[in-house]
């Protein structure tokens, strides 16, 4: 098992240090409608974005930048792009045509509270706002900003969020299966794409090399697999009965112990990639601790 000495700051200290700055930046860049045409749109935007959440994606962007010497205060506008896209994906995921979920994070889902039409508009608003966060706010680094902008396009597209959602729809209808982890990784397209986006945007804006970005992408994909598999294990632990006619997952098909072993293998491989390819730093230490957290989290 790969271990690393504790560095200057623990993961949770790092998150707390940047939490206020993240929340401030989220509020400063809300995709709000002008007062003249505003109805309930702005209320729905705030409801969707400030309904809880760990702000994992902004933290990943900051860590991705700091891994290559970037500064949080410079990267911050771009750091919230992943959170906007993540929020949009949750809204779409809950819609009647998708998962038809009535709750999200213990609260009424957006389409249940504000209506399906407004929920779709809010989701599109978050996606649209994410582009400007990297391009407009980092115009002084045009080449890097363009590369970061391209990351958003890829994340949202068929190789990422849209593709992942289409896989979810197919699995819900009984097409395909997740009886092996290769198929499960396809199911995780949305999760892994957002992890990859968050880390790579920060790294790109900090000047990471192409080779470093390739390595970081592999780590991000493993992080996404670990996050999704731990989610499935949490669901399995909370109430296995709910899966009677629901979408099958690797954890359900293969059993809890097999899934736990698979999760441990993913975590160790992700940590190995970090340790072997990036020098010791606060950012690396926090990413290692985050990887361990995903293997141990209960909610």
Q: What are the language-model segments listed below?
A:
Residues 31-273, 283-295:
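Mg2+-dependent prenyl diphosphate-binding active-site environment of isoprenoid biosynthetic enzymes
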Residues 277-279:
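Short helix-capping segments at alpha-helix termini
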Residues 1-30, 299:
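N-terminal amphipathic/basic leader segments beginning at the initiator methionine
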């Amino acid at each position: 098992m790969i271990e690393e000495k504790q560095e200057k700051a623990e993961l949770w200290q790092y998150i707390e240090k940047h939490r206020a700055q993240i929340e401030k930046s989220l509020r400063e860049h809300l995709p709000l409608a002008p007062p003249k045409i505003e109805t309930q749109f702005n209320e729905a935007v705030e409801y969707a974005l400030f309904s809880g959440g760990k702000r994992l994606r902004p933290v990943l962007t900051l860590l991705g930048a700091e891994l290559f010497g970037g500064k949080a205060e410079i990267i911050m506008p771009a750091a919230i792009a992943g959170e906007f896209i993540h929020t949009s994906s949750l809204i779409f995921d809950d819609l009647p045509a998708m998962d038809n979920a009535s709750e999200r994070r213990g609260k009424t889902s957006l389409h249940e509270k504000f209506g399906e039409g407004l929920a779709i508009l809010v989701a599109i608003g978050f996606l649209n706002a994410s582009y400007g966060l990297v391009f407009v706010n980092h115009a002084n680094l045009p080449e890097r900003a363009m590369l970061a902008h391209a990351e958003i396009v890829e994340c949202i597209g068929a190789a990422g969020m849209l593709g992942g959602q289409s896989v979810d729809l197919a699995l819900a209808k009984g097409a395909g299966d997740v009886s092996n982890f290769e198929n499960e990784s396809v199911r995780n397209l949305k999760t892994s794409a957002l992890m990859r986006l968050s880390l790579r945007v920060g790294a790109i804006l900090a000047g990471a090399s192409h080779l470093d970005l390739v390595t970081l992408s592999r780590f991000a994909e493993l992080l996404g697999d670990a996050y999704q598999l731990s989610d499935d294990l949490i669901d399995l632990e909370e109430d296995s009965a709910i899966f009677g006619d629901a979408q099958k997952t690797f954890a359900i098909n293969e059993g809890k112990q097999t899934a736990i072993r698979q999760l441990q293998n993913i975590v160790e491989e992700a940590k190995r990639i970090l340790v072997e390819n990036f020098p010791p730093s606060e950012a690396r230490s926090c990413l290692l601790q985050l990887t361990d957290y995903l293997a141990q989290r209960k909610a």
